[in-house]
Amino acid sequence: MDTHAFKRSLHHSERYNRRGFGRAEEVAESLEQAYQSGLIGTIRDNGYRLEHGRLNVRLAEAFGFCWGVERAVAMAYETRKHYPSERLWITNEIIHNPSVNDHLREMDVQFIPVEQGVKDFSGVTSGDVVILPAFGATVQEMQLLNERGCHIVDTTCPWVSKVWNTVEKHKKHTFTSIIHGKVKHEETLATSSFAGTYLVVLDLEEAQYVADYILGNGDREDFIKRFAKACSPGFDPDRDLERLGVANQTTMLKSETEEIGRLFERTMLSKYGPTQLNDHFLAFNTICDATQERQDAMFSLVDEPLDLMVVIGGFNSSNTTHLQEIAVSRGIRSFHIDTPERIDVGSNSIEHKPLAADLCREGDFLPEGPVRVGITSGASTPDRAVEEVIEKLMQLSEN
């Protein structure tokens, strides 16, 4: 399928919208009440610091809603305002934040049901309005909705669209796309649907395994088994790893994406030599600015003397998880929560999700005496949620 031609055709359809409806002022008050925070604005103006008795809060200097998320949420609100009585669907969570998605449900936005990991579009009919979330949607989903006669509102982040353009470039020039991402993440599923031949690698360890295979140090059957669910149909590691381009899920850890890119460049240089490198490797730049800014701010924050860290964001949020990884890597006592309600003031306990583990509750959350708390949040977390976490910390510090 010529995905580039399909996108171009879809973008010219009268039933497709990716620019909003000119109703920003009409939804501004609702957005402000639901997601913005006067307290957070005050803390920003005070050098990202708050002192309250024995409590000393340090905010990361970049956190919370990024531009792409703000745009997607605002477009969803505009869509309901523009289509007040039409049946309105969304193909997935608009962003990885439970409170934001709950607000959409309250606005009678229906989420496409999922049965055993497969989306069920049978309830969507001609004339329905369907929102594509910030992560995007697969080209097959777009094609289905277009053929069904739906009105499509596309809130895909432009940074994600940039990655799609990158893998389409790989496909055009018969390069295999090495996608640094999580194979089941909505964004990676969408990106791979625009690629030709592709392979998804989760981390540097998997990338090194692939690089070793390219240089003749691997087992074909083991390779095929390991990446059976992370590659394009019919992928042949002996045929499809000769010409590589690198792309990424925009919310992955920036430093790891860059290292994976350098690894494959060195690998192809070693195998083919400098004169043929450009025929076998395509450089890339698909790292999202907002992801980079939040990670850089987190690295700065964890350099400060902190007693504990609170990271706020959806448990299925990739960019939030990577912020938690940064804190844990520095040995900081850090807690990843998805909503302020995870903190129980009465018992001084917190329900949180450790890395690669299930939810658990921990007592003696806020220690006695002077305490320095670092706070950050993922790109899908509104300021209002951060405010509510800080208010709970203030209450705990007064007990």
Curated annotation (Swiss-Prot):
Instruction: Check the record and name the InterPro entries matching this protein.
Output: LytB/IspH
Per UniProt, where does dimethylallyl diphosphate bind?
Answer: H96, H185, S317, S318, N319, S380
Chain ranges passing through the membrane: none
Which sites bind (2E)-4-hydroxy-3-methylbut-2-enyl diphosphate? H96, H185, T250, S317, S318, N319, S380
Catalyzed reactions per annotation: isopentenyl diphosphate + 2 oxidized [2Fe-2S]-[ferredoxin] + H2O = (2E)-4-hydroxy-3-methylbut-2-enyl diphosphate + 2 reduced [2Fe-2S]-[ferredoxin] + 2 H(+); dimethylallyl diphosphate + 2 oxidized [2Fe-2S]-[ferredoxin] + H2O = (2E)-4-hydroxy-3-methylbut-2-enyl diphosphate + 2 reduced [2Fe-2S]-[ferredoxin] + 2 H(+)
Keywords of the record, alphabetical order, are: 4Fe-4S, Iron, Iron-sulfur, Isoprene biosynthesis, Metal-binding, Oxidoreductase
Pathway membership, UniProt: Isoprenoid biosynthesis; dimethylallyl diphosphate biosynthesis; dimethylallyl diphosphate from (2E)-4-hydroxy-3-methylbutenyl diphosphate: step 1/1; Isoprenoid biosynthesis; isopentenyl diphosphate biosynthesis via DXP pathway; isopentenyl diphosphate from 1-deoxy-D-xylulose 5-phosphate: step 6/6
Where along the chain is isopentenyl diphosphate bound?
H96, H185, S317, S318, N319, S380
- Residue numbers binding [4Fe-4S] cluster: C66, C157, C288
Single biological process term from Gene Ontology: terpenoid biosynthetic process
For this chain's record, the cofactor binding note is: Binds 1 [4Fe-4S] cluster per subunit.
The active site is formed by: E187 (proton donor)
Cofactor entry = [4Fe-4S] cluster
State its Enzyme Commission number(s).
1.17.7.4
Could you state a single Gene Ontology molecular function term? 4-hydroxy-3-methylbut-2-enyl diphosphate reductase activity
Residue ranges annotated as coiled coil are none
Q: Which Pfam families match?
A: LYTB
Classification via HAMAP family? IspH
Function recorded in the entry = Catalyzes the conversion of 1-hydroxy-2-methyl-2-(E)-butenyl 4-diphosphate (HMBPP) into a mixture of isopentenyl diphosphate (IPP) and dimethylallyl diphosphate (DMAPP). Acts in the terminal step of the DOXP/MEP pathway for isoprenoid precursor biosynthesis.
NCBIfam families, alphabetized: ispH_lytB (TIGR00216), PRK13371.1 (NF009911)
Which family is this sequence assigned to?
Belongs to the IspH family.
The molecule here is called 4-hydroxy-3-methylbut-2-enyl diphosphate reductase
Species name: Synechococcus sp. (strain CC9605)
